[in-house]
Curated annotation (Swiss-Prot):
Residues 1-11 have a biased composition (Polar residues). This is Transcriptional repressor NrdR. Negatively regulates transcription of bacterial ribonucleotide reductase nrd genes and operons by binding to NrdR-boxes. GO terms for molecular function: ATP binding; double-stranded DNA binding; zinc ion binding. It comes from the Bacteria. It comes from Bradyrhizobium diazoefficiens (strain JCM 10833 / BCRC 13528 / IAM 13628 / NBRC 14792 / USDA 110). Residues 1-20 are annotated as: Disordered. Its cofactor is Zn(2+). Keywords: ATP-binding, DNA-binding, Metal-binding, Nucleotide-binding, Repressor, Transcription, Transcription regulation, Zinc, Zinc-finger. Belongs to the NrdR family.
Length: 160
């Protein structure tokens, strides 16, 4: 591992431990050349995914881009970062174990929406508005109607 301070390749791992959900390994490192201490994170990657964009282009899957888009939809919402990280890890794991090395951006978007729907309704609507390219207020009303209908069905099931 290259030292971010002096660019030396001579570093040592001082401490290694998994995160709470064991999806990431946190390593505390020290540079032998300058004694700079830094932390790295390692994540298991089951397979290389390629995203097929709507215009047909193929690009490598970027977990960080997925995380950024989810975080944008959750901006100013009271959702713990650990829950967001766990949700994104779950989504990535589902995509990696789905059997296909190439996956359409539509499948990724629908998977994210499915998970956001259970995490935070407002984030779900925000993400849907960008992903589904809402053009008018009716588009928002339709999604809100879906959410209201699901809530009414859930309450009716509880009452029975």
């Amino acid at each position: 591992m290259r030292c971010p301070n002096c660019n030396s390749l001579d570093t040592q791992v001082k401490d290694s431990r998994p995160t709470e959900d064991s999806s990431v390994i946190r390593r505390r490192r020290v540079c032998v050349a300058c004694n700079f201490r830094f932390t790295t994170f390692e994540r298991v990657q089951l397979r290389e995914l390629t995203v097929i964009k709507r215009n047909g282009r193929r690009v490598p899957f970027d977990r960080d881009k997925l995380m950024r888009s989810v975080q944008i939809s959750l901006r100013k919402r009271q959702v713990e970062p650990e829950r967001v990280e766990k949700m994104v890890s779950t989504i990535v794991r589902e995509l990696e174990t789905g059997g296909e090395a190439e996956i359409s951006s539509e499948v990724i978007g629908e998977t994210v929406m499915e998970h956001l729907r259970t995490l935070d309704d407002v984030a779900y609507v925000r993400f849907a508005s960008v992903y589904r390219n809402f053009r008018e207020a009716k588009d928002f009303a339709d999604v809100l109607g879906e959410l209201s209908g699901e809530e009414e069905a859930r309450l009716a099931a509880i009452r029975k």
